[in-house]
């Protein structure tokens, strides 16, 4: 009998995203906050990304630290986000956190929903 070990591909939390999270946390004045990214059903492609700030971290959450700030992902969302890049972009369409997900077969035009 052989046992295989599964090591999920981590998320990349870019310096730009971490810097924006730090700025927003400083504005809130609550150093316990972390950016939580999650996946829910919905959107025009089947799944959609969500972002919120959270103080509470569950035992089974994944926490990725960069430059003194944290990105938190629950286990259900992590399976859809493994190998993704979480970034922050500013442009003509506005400023927002974006996810570049190699697991997504299709994405909608706004980049907020996807299908596998």
Swiss-Prot record:
A GO term (biological process) for this protein? Answer: iron-sulfur cluster assembly
List the keywords (alphabetical): Iron, Iron-sulfur, Metal-binding
GO CC list: cytosol
Q: Which cofactor does it need?
A: iron-sulfur cluster
MF GO annotations: 2 iron, 2 sulfur cluster binding; 4 iron, 4 sulfur cluster binding; iron ion binding
Which sites bind iron-sulfur cluster? 44, 108, 110
Q: Per its UniProt entry, which superkingdom is the organism in?
A: Bacteria
Q: What does the cofactor section's free text say about binding?
A: Binds 1 iron-sulfur cluster per subunit.
The record's annotation in Pfam families points to:
Fe-S_biosyn
Q: What does this protein do?
A: Required for insertion of 4Fe-4S clusters for at least IspG.
Entry's family note: Belongs to the HesB/IscA family.
Supply the PANTHER family for this chain: IRON-SULFUR CLUSTER ASSEMBLY 2 HOMOLOG, MITOCHONDRIAL
Subunit structure comment from the entry: Homodimer.
The protein's name is Iron-sulfur cluster insertion protein ErpA
Q: What is the lineage of its organism?
A: Bacteria, Pseudomonadati, Pseudomonadota, Gammaproteobacteria, Pseudomonadales
């Amino acid at each position: 009998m052989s046992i295989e070990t599964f090591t999920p591909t981590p998320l990349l939390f870019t310096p730009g995203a971490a810097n924006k999270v730090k700025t927003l946390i400083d504005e809130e004045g609550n150093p316990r906050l972390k950016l939580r990214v999650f996946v829910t059903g919905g959107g025009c492609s089947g799944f959609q990304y969500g972002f919120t700030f959270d103080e509470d971290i569950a035992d089974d959450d994944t926490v990725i630290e960069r430059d003194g700030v944290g990105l938190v992902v629950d286990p259900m969302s992590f399976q859809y986000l493994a190998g993704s890049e979480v970034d922050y972009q500013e442009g003509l369409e506005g400023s927002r956190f974006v996810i570049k997900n190699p697991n997504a077969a299709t994405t909608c035009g706004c980049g907020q929903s996807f299908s596998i």
